[in-house]
UniProtKB/Swiss-Prot annotation:
Entry's family note: Belongs to the universal ribosomal protein uS11 family.
One Pfam family matching this protein: Ribosomal_S11
Reported function: Located on the platform of the 30S subunit, it bridges several disparate RNA helices of the 16S rRNA. Forms part of the Shine-Dalgarno cleft in the 70S ribosome.
Recorded GO CC terms: ribonucleoprotein complex; ribosome
Self-association state and partner proteins as the record states: Part of the 30S ribosomal subunit. Interacts with proteins S7 and S18. Binds to IF-3.
Organism: Alkaliphilus metalliredigens (strain QYMF)
Molecular function per GO: rRNA binding; structural constituent of ribosome
The name this protein goes by in its record: Small ribosomal subunit protein uS11
Keywords: Ribonucleoprotein, Ribosomal protein, RNA-binding, rRNA-binding
Xref: InterPro entries: Ribosomal_uS11, Ribosomal_uS11_bac-type, Ribosomal_uS11_CS, Ribosomal_uS11_sf
Annotated gene: rpsK
GO annotation terms (biological process): translation
PROSITE patterns noted in UniProt: RIBOSOMAL_S11
Length: 132
């Protein structure tokens, strides 16, 4: 019986890019918070969201969940050498300010904060009013 000879495959370790300047995109909706850290061209370095960290249901929309997201994303991006960021905030959620503060507390220097929330020129009809 013939023996099966396996070829040895050499796997190279993925190169870590040393990126010093980047962008932080914080999307804070009524239901969740997503923090994405990118280089200046928009290529993702690291990201995190509330559901990924174990928050479920209505706890995903809290400022504390957004803070934990920002810390986790900053930690993964700082391994690539990220030091200075420009922050772009999108959405009406509760975790906007908490995420920015968490990025600063994690050791990233914030050089710019910009609100890029899309504002309709009377586009889609908004959801009906809640009656509680």
């Amino acid at each position: 019986m013939a023996k099966v000879v396996r070829k040895k495959t050499v796997r190279r370790k993925k190169d870590r890019k040393n990126i010093e300047r980047g962008q932080a995109h914080i999307q804070s909706t009524f239901n969740n918070s997503i923090v994405t850290l990118t280089d200046m061209q928009g290529n993702t370095i690291g990201w995190s969201c509330a559901g990924q960290l174990g928050f479920k249901g209505s706890r995903k929309s809290t400022p504390f969940a957004a803070q934990m997201c920002a810390e986790a994303a900053a930690k993964s991006a700082m391994e690539h050498g990220l030091k200075t960021i420009e922050v772009f905030v999108k959405g009406p959620g509760a975790g906007r300010e908490a995420a920015i503060r968490a990025l600063q507390a994690a050791g990233l220097e914030v050089s710019l904060i910009k609100d890029v929330t899309p504002i309709p020129h009377n586009g889609c009809r908004p959801p009906k009013r809640r009656r509680v």
